[in-house]
Amino acid sequence: MSFSSDVKEELAKQVSKSRHCQLAELAGIIELSGRINEKTKGLELDTENLLLLNKYATLMKRAFGTDTTKALDEQDTGKILAALKITAQPVNRQTADGLLLMQTCCRRAFIRGAFMAAGSISDPNKAYHFEIVCHTKEQAKQLQELLCGFDTDAKIVERKGHYVVYIKEGAHIVDSLNIMEAYVSLMKLENVRILKEMRNSVNRKVNCETANISKTVNAAVKQIEAIRLIQKMRGLDDLPAQLREMALLRLEYPDAPLKELGGYLDPPMGKSGVNHRLRKLSAIAEELR
């Protein structure tokens, strides 16, 4: 499976318990992948993607008690579209009503639905690229504003009659996965990103021995992964002051050896002391896994 498929598989398993978030996510799906059947006048999805169809079916069942294995009639469709504030046709060229996006959790859900319906993300080992393809400029602008509201650098480009909302910066793609709550995929991408940054930095340090470089990189990656996990699951502010200081230092200087890290402390600390604190952080992260 591709990395993009892995992300969607993870998102497909997430179903909000709140109906308002379910409606927001459905709006994101329908407004980019929905259509009205000309014969039955019922709502359906214009896709063969099983992950999307299953997620759509689950959300429709939770939010409306609707069985999507049976064709929706015009009356049921009208009720559903009214609840989703979709009042015009075609349904896949509308923008979301602001009432559906008033809460932060609902904005996250809408973005998640839009990505499930029309998004993709490249293999981070090859390139950094996140995108969602919209039918109209208005849809793209709304989605861009929502993503930028979470401090991502989302941009728009026109491509073959569609409007593509995209993100190229690796850190902002990590943020987009966080927005959609794809935490497993986030950690995978973050690990790749850290490795790339570390290797780029290491390549500039021509006086280092290859074996020591590999050992330092691998150890630092594991340390940063542990700190990121603590940050996501618990928050660094909850740590004892000494461990919080060490965690922040490791994040600020991802490629620094233990001796250099110790020099940034006040008073300075030796390699063994730095290593002891980093091991404590790793132990905390292990308990959270």
Where are the model-predicted features located?
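N-terminal low-complexity or simple alpha-helical regulatory segments
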Residues: 1-85, 89
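Structural motif
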Residues: 15-23, 100-107, 237-241
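Short, hydrophobic/amphipathic alpha-helical patches that form generic packing surfaces
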Residues: 24-32, 109-117, 248
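Short acidic (Asp/Glu) and glycine-rich catalytic loops that position anionic groups and cofactors
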Residues: 36-37, 123, 156, 204, ...
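Short acidic, hydrophobic short linear motifs in intrinsically disordered regions
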Residues: 39-43, 125-127, 257-259
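DNA-contacting interfaces and partner/effector-binding or oligomerization modules
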Residues: 47, 54, 58-190
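Extended mid-to-C-terminal alpha-helical interaction segments
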Residues: 181-279
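Short, solvent-exposed alpha-helical "recognition" segments
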Residues: 278-289
